[in-house]
């Protein structure tokens, strides 16, 4: 009678230790040279003031490609140079029930991500100060791919604003 109880207790203890270590590895860590991530509310206010675009990194806690972009791509000097010059960076947890306010509407981060067309993680969205999506892309992007994606979106947005003003 005691033997199954001891075995069950040992299995649960090992499972607890395993889960603790697994979640410890996926929790956010301080990354040197990481962008100064803003909330969507802050980014939209700043974009309205200075005309820069908003880049939104939609991630999932357990996503290894999301972690790789966070650790290796966003802090890269060439990526940071483009972000710092032309963008306000935002991070959204695509599975979070935490609320945010976008264009006066309160919703969960998950609802916001889905409203942007989320199909897979990571999902990167670039929008203007009005909340108009300029471009989006799903999946991992390396440094060159992300910087080119941002430059293309910036050029596309410049073309849109040139057309609307003339």
Per-range role (PLM):
Residues 48-49, 81-84, 116-119:
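Extracellular/periplasmic catalytic domains that process cell-envelope and extracellular macromolecules
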Residues 66-84:
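Typically the conserved alpha-helix immediately C-terminal to a functionally engaged Cys/Sec
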